[in-house]
Amino acid sequence: MAFLKARLAALLSVAVSCSAVLYDDAKKLPSTSYDYIVVGGGTAGSVLANRLTEDAKTQVLVLEGGPSGQGVLELEIPFYNLYGPHDPLWNWNISVLPQDTAADRVLVYPAGRVLGGTSMINGMYYSRGPSSDWDRMAAITGDSGWSWDKIYPYFIKSEVLTPSVGGRNTTGELDPSIHGKQGIVATSSPNWSYETDPLIISALNELGGPYSPILDFNNGSPLGVAWFQYTMRNGSREDAATSYFADKFLGRSNLHVLVNATVDRVVQSKSGGPVNGVEYHLSNGTGSTLHATANKEVIVSAGTFGTPHLLLNSGIGDNSTLASYNVTPIAHVPDVGKNLTDYSTVILTWSVNSTTTLYDLITKNETFANDSLAQWTASHTGPFSNGVSNHMFNLRLNETDPEVQQMLKQYGDPSSSDKAPHITLQFVEGGLGSGNSISMENFVVTPLSRGSVTLNTTDPSGPPVVDAGILTSPFDVFVLEQGILAARKFLSASAWDNYIIAPASGLDAGIPVDGSVNTTALESYIRTQATAGWRETGTAKMSPKGARWGVVDPDFRVKNVQGLRVVDASVFPEIPSLHTQIPIYAIAERAADLIKGSH
């Protein structure tokens, strides 16, 4: 779609500001020694860099593997997250091994390769998760500081609620009393009304029960259907780069950010000593190894794939496995790279009696798309000022159903409580095929399937070997099947009688228009169409201090290693059940306080 591929010149170079703290040349750095080195300037690393440099005497170096995305149109337009995530300019595009449980397909994970990390290319969802998710994390780690009551102030600290643009009346779409007013990351209600919004509201009022509307899913009790909230400011994407790395913070003389700098190893100055430095190279340079020293700590925030890859290459992992890679072990931490956890999702599409579904208009009507882009460029309003969905459905399995009861008896209930969802549906106006349609993205948000991240035996320093483990648990397939039935139930409301035509080809075999269910066809559809949910976590999971399992203690310190912490999505012992962006911001905020308090 050429009309959406507008870019500013010199995308891969960085215009160094007059403050001289954003660099693309290591030779221009003022020093090779800092108090803290943060590996990765993404969703978590940005928070750490910002908060640690609030003390003007603390010197911080951030090493980011990607370029700066400042001023790049495709990273600013909210609606563009439908198109931009796979662009290799901004994305590591992590390929996984063929998944024999998903028709032997090779799936691709987006991972932000840009200052600001995956917050630059994600769906911008503002979701804190159920309170019980956080209470479970506190119980698993033995640290009450991870409970909902203790983490809640960090949500408020990081957020600033802002008005929607374009004059939309957002009354009743959220509860302002539970949102931050003076934080760093801007949030808002949707900026655009879809033609299906009134139909959704009518259907909710008709069906009730699990489809009952709720005011705000960020109060810790998210079950029901609510308006989405987004990390957006004045009609533009709000991300880690525009918030925690805003110009006023990059202007600090003690914050030094080097882009296009990939860290190869964390290192010790002597065997058995603390980690006190890194080796890295510049992607836009000669590839020669460069060095930087941390006087206090090295903090790894390289993400769910990058963090275990870096730890393993540094000799932190299972000793025998490391030896097979010809990597010299420095710490025996066997769980590094294990426990890869992600939602699985399948997109459900129905043809509709309409010619104006938004996504279809944008992708099939170039005049409309160009006009929408022009409107956004002029005023940051219009359809491009919004995310792709206005409503989120958070549902539990129907525990009065004997089949559900049997599955829960066999596999246990992986949700954190009876107030947390198993299923999330996201309504999208548009979809697959040549005609007009609506879609519902169907996620299992309490997956039992697990994967792994390891090194390539022939090239350990090359891209990681990722086995997503998608749909390895029959429970996950069952939950996706139940999600399909829940979506069909919602679309059976009379509000849709003159709008919905039929399920799309493939889906129609599992849920024919006669109302029957073909479970064999449904499973086949899921295994051939399901993909990763792009909320991957868990590969450096947190466990109680002193535990022999896990990778980091509750204060993020890597087990059996001094001077090294991990702060990013990889530390979650269980995947948050409502997106991951905001939980990552929250844990990084607390990590910054813990780090400050330890020195």
Swiss-Prot record:
Signal peptide location: 1-20
Highest rank taxon of the organism: Eukaryota
Which Enzyme Commission number(s) are listed? 1.1.-.-
Q: Which residues are glycosylated?
A: N93, N169, N191, N234, N260, N284, N319, N339, N353, N365, N370, N398, N456, N518
Pfam annotation, one family? GMC_oxred_C
Q: List the disulfide bonds.
A: none
Sorted keywords for this record are: FAD, Flavoprotein, Glycoprotein, Oxidoreductase, Signal
Give me the residues that bind FAD, please. Answer: T43, A44, E64, G65, N122, G123, M124, Y125, A569, T580, Q581
GO MF, one term, reads: oxidoreductase activity, acting on CH-OH group of donors
Q: Which cofactor does it need?
A: FAD
Which PROSITE patterns does its entry note?
Answer: GMC_OXRED_1, GMC_OXRED_2
Described function: Dehydrogenase; part of the gene cluster that mediates the biosynthesis of erinacines, cyathane-xylosides that show unique biological activities, including leishmanicidal activity, stimulating activity for nerve growth-factor synthesis, and agonistic activity toward the kappa opioid receptor. The role of the dehydrogenase eriK within the pathway has still to be determined.
Which family, according to the similarity comment?
Answer: Belongs to the GMC oxidoreductase family.
Quaternary context: Homodimer.
Q: What is this protein called?
A: Dehydrogenase eriK
